[in-house]
Amino acid sequence: MKVIFMKADLNLIKTLHPLEIKVIVNNEEEDDISASIIIEKLGFNEGQANKTIEWLNSKGIIEEIYRKLNVFYKATERGLGALRDGFVEEKIINLVSQKAVLASNLALELDIDVKEVRKAFGNLLKEGILSLDLDKQIIINCLDGTETNYQKVRVLLERAKNSDLLRESLTTEELLLISNFAKKKGADSVFFKIIEKLDLKFRLSSFGLEVKNFLMKSKLTGDELTKLTPEILKNKTYENKKFRAYNIHIPSAKTFIGRANSYLDYISKIKDKLVGLGFQEFDGPLVETEFFNNDALFMPQFHPSRDIKDVYYISDPSMQESLPEPYFSNVKLAHETGYATGSRGWRYSFSEDLSKRLVLRTHGTVLSAKQLINAKNPSRYFGVIRCFRYDQVDATHGVDFYQTEGIVIEDGVSIKTLLGLLEIFAKELAGATEIKYVPAYFPFTEPSIEIHVKHPVLGWFELGGSGIFRPEVTKPLGIDLPVIAWGIGIDRMALMHLGLNDLRDLFTYDIGDVILRRGKIDAKVRNL
């Protein structure tokens, strides 16, 4: 019978991959086709076998005849470690059989993680192998020779050490037991990992048989050359060989080129806006002394925000050798007596060692304090600064974040000037339509103001803090003019401006999600 193909079919046949051709011409109508069979029969590796089956199935050359999901239990490193080093249950029994042990001292005696010991000890109590007397001392009960659960798990691990355990090969009792020690995800913490493998079998379809006849008549074997290289030309290995046909009408693969990150682009636009308003940019190191991070800002050394629970301290080196004079002495006096400000200060004994400690900067105002030393009159400065705080991560908080920090040093600046700048941040840069100013307290500003904005999903939240620097901040650093200052969370501004509901979306690794919202975000950033 003469086989007649449509033009589209001929194009498909001519562009078959050599691996596909090998599978087609080496299988008969009744032959089963699967990845394992191809590997054994044709010498493909696993990747080649799976990919070839996927190609052939998508083209209708083979058709599925069998499908089954097999579940296996694979011994994890933790399980093999228990097999090698002993189960915690075994170690508990060995210890208790040698000496009297209180339940509360068990983890300490074994030098094993408390959670692991509690779990193993609980299992032994549940099985009745151990019990407690009135003094909470552990007692080993008489065993009747019955195999314990951990001994049964040991047997299963011994079997799984050589080959994965197929669920169907396990008894009902073994399945119930192994389910307590197995996970599909996060299996590092258990003895077995659950692995699912789909067993698929195919056969040549009617179309596939026609394709095979065409290939056989065309004397195509899958050994055809796929590319023309200098070596082939030089050695003339192309002689008596056929080349694989190429379909020039097939669209080329999509190229994903690098593009500007929308969030970094947003930060760049903020910088452009502030420079356009006459500000100069400043920057500084991530690691700062407590002196500039807190002391120079008139934050007392007993302030709760300086606690180790809120700050990342540097362990090596832990302290800076010296601090700049006369500013250190001036700040010390400001804390102890108020310096020349009319204030009485905080009235405590100021510690130089504490002031020298190194920390990851917790706020951008640290750079404003450093800038005051060299500031001109009048002047405007800003920075886009990465800050670090020990915080609980949620939709509006992160352990590291960007702030835009700034100061204006000028005769005549006032709260009115500050409110105008804050409105620019909230409305023009963050895109907020509803804002409010809330009285606040910061040790380094008086008066102090927080600006809050209303998010359509998250509701009201703080965008940042601001105020006029206290004389106890400015005078010890050589400034006798009023200074307005602010620290605004750029991450939160971006949350508003880019239409997101969670700070973590700014740093997502989900490329699909980024691509879906890129057009909308890029348009908003361009319109800043």
From Swiss-Prot:
Record PANTHER family: PHENYLALANINE--TRNA LIGASE ALPHA SUBUNIT, PHENYLALANYL-TRNA SYNTHETASE
Family stated for the protein in its record: Belongs to the class-II aminoacyl-tRNA synthetase family. Phe-tRNA synthetase alpha subunit type 2 subfamily.
Protein name per its UniProtKB record: Phenylalanine--tRNA ligase alpha subunit
Entries under InterPro entries matching the protein: aa-tRNA-synth_II (IPR006195), aa-tRNA-synth_II/BPL/LPL (IPR045864), Phe-tRNA-synth_IIc_asu (IPR004529), Phe_tRNA_ligase_alpha_bac/arc (IPR022917), Phenylalanyl-tRNA_Synthase (IPR002319)
Cofactor field: Mg(2+)
Keyword check for Transmembrane helix: no
Substrates-to-products reaction catalysed: tRNA(Phe) + L-phenylalanine + ATP = L-phenylalanyl-tRNA(Phe) + AMP + diphosphate + H(+)
